[in-house]
């Protein structure tokens, strides 16, 4: 993929008529109007994406992008990069947190080595390595233009393959030590936010280490003049291969017209990048949960998305998105199988203009 090819991608808008039809069917179910709350909008959105009132999200997968980040050299994380490889290995045998959740939720886990700093071929993990991790953005740009484009293209291609394999809804996940630093750097630069206001402790930092993390991010933003840069340049300079790959997943889902669930802050940053690079991609995105990471709130506000879950989660791997898939299944149970007012021989609730 070239930059010109990325810039030329056009996302088709959703058809309002399908959204309205699903909402009308929801209103005909024997329950209070909007009784399922936010889920009614999400169900109607999925219907508009699928262009049907007979919604199906039975075949599900979570794409987990695994990659290392050179900025870990700056001691911005409690753990070293060896943890990325260890967790990826666990994912390959469904022994990580997302694997256990996905087994309960009926979701297939597809872990992807898009940039782990290792020469190992990891059993159960798709080998799609663009590079063995990024460079330390405190010293030099994290990626080349070619690496970013390859990672985005990889994400798009993975979605296309999932579509061919019959998957009806996808979730996004990631694993990469240091990626709360990269994601916060991207969000702060892209949304022109104060670094201290959107930087969290990640997997656990002391107050002193948090200050160092903020300093590393702020210095990089200033060094590369990122507050005046475009989204692609920001991603290339302080982002990660996992973020770039997930950006491709969101773009690919919009191209293939498949609903895709956002997980926490790292995938939320990728969602923001996807919408910035390819306007309209957000219409195919389903928010899941409010992350403990501070930047996520600002991103959701910018995307005009409203996460359903508020459980103070910060686990990563796609776990929040997988939980959201379970809740969508439950809500769809009412939509697909719920009795109508006619079944009960009672009058349907009417909507009145407010």
Question: Positions of the model-derived regions?
Answer:
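N-terminal loops that bind phosphate or other acidic moieties
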Residues: 2-354
């Amino acid at each position: 993929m070239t930059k010109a090819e990325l810039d030329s991608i056009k996302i088709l808008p959703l058809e309002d008529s399908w959204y309205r039809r699903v909402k009308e069917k929801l209103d005909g179910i024997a329950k209070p109007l909007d009784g399922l709350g936010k889920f009614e909008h999400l169900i109607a959105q999925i219907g508009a994406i699928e262009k049907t009132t007979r919604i199906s999200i039975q075949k599900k997968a979570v794409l987990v992008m695994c990659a290392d980040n050179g900025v870990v050299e700056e001691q911005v994380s409690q753990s070293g990069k060896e943890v990325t490889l260890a967790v990826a290995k666990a994912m390959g045998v469904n022994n990580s947190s997302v694997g256990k959740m996905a087994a309960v939720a009926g979701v297939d886990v597809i872990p992807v080595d898009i940039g782990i700093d290792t020469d190992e071929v990891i059993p159960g993990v798709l080998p799609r390595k663009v590079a063995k991790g990024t460079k330390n953005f405190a010293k030099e740009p994290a990626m080349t233009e070619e690496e970013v484009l390859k990672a985005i293209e990889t994400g798009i291609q993975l979605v296309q393959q999932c579509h061919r394999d019959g998957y009806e809804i996808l979730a996004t996940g990631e694993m990469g030590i240091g990626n709360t630093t990269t994601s916060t750097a991207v969000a702060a630069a892209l949304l022109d936010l104060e670094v201290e206001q959107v930087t969290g402790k990640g997997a656990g930092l002391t107050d002193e280490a948090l200050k160092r993390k903020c300093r590393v991010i702020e210095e990089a933003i200033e060094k590369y003049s990122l507050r005046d840069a475009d989204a692609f340049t920001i991603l290339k300079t302080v982002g990660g291969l996992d973020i770039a790959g997930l950006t491709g997943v969101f773009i690919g889902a919009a191209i293939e017209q498949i609903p895709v669930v956002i997980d926490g802050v790292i995938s939320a940053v990728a969602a923001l990048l996807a919408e910035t690079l390819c306007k309209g991609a957000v219409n195919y995105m389903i928010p899941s949960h409010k992350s403990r990471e501070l930047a996520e709130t600002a991103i959701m506000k910018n995307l005009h998305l409203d996460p359903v879950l508020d459980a103070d989660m910060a686990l990563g791997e796609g776990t929040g998105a997988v939980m959201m898939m379970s809740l969508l299944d439950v809500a769809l149970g009412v939509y697909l199988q719920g009795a109508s007012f006619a079944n009960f021989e009672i009058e349907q609730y009417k909507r009145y203009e407010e």
